[in-house]
Amino acid sequence: RDFCLSRGLGDVYKRQGSLIRPEATGYGNVYFLLQMLKTRNIDIKDKVVCVSGSGNVAQYTVEKLISLGAKVVTMSDSDGYIYDPDGIDREKLDYIMELKNLYRGRIREYAEQYGCKYVQGARPWGEKCDIAMPSATQNELNGDDAKTLLANGCFAVSEGANMPSTPEAIDAFLEAKILYAPGKAANAGGVSVSGLEMTQNAQKLSWSSEEVDQKLQSIMENIHEQCVKYGKQEDGYVNYVKGANVAGFMKVAKA
């Protein structure tokens, strides 16, 4: 089953380029999250996750989380968010993909379909969760949102969108010493798979989606290793912001 192909999104990628590029950013973010959780011996299974957004990145973030046994309770769009305490399962995600990718519908229709809570004009960060994965837009998570997440017991934040957390939110996460992955590290999957495509095209290679997925996992593990190498503090806490910045600088310096 190749859901993205059935939605008409993947034909281009099937013909030219990597088979799983539409999934790359979302999958890659989850792979980075898994590496972070491993540093604290935390299993993702049954963890409650708040995801924002309902576009490409959010959809594939949720798809991968479901396959790993996590419980995703929120998704959102520019009008508001849904909160489903039973968790978004494969069937419900298929509904969202069809709603968004084919019909350009609104997320509130999910609440009508499945009888769950819909909150107009708000973001999902007030809901209780173990992990938050902002995957919608820039500056969608502010200092107050961060404090609410922390007060509700959130111990990991991994960014799928570009710069979704404001500087105040980032400061709050680092001060609380939770696992916090900035987008420049966690959402690098899309860029990475584009790089794999160039390699494939240049060398006239053809990789299966499984091979590309394996390479994506390895790339995200490598990025995580670099972040730990340059971001680990004396007290053992890994500052992934510093780690990503220094790792990026070292890469440029060596180039």
Where are the regions a protein language model picked out?
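Single conserved hydrophobic/aromatic residue that forms the stacking wall/gate
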Residues: 2-9, 13
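Glycine-rich phosphate/diphosphate-binding loop of Rossmann-like nucleotide-binding domains
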Residues: 15-23, 27-128
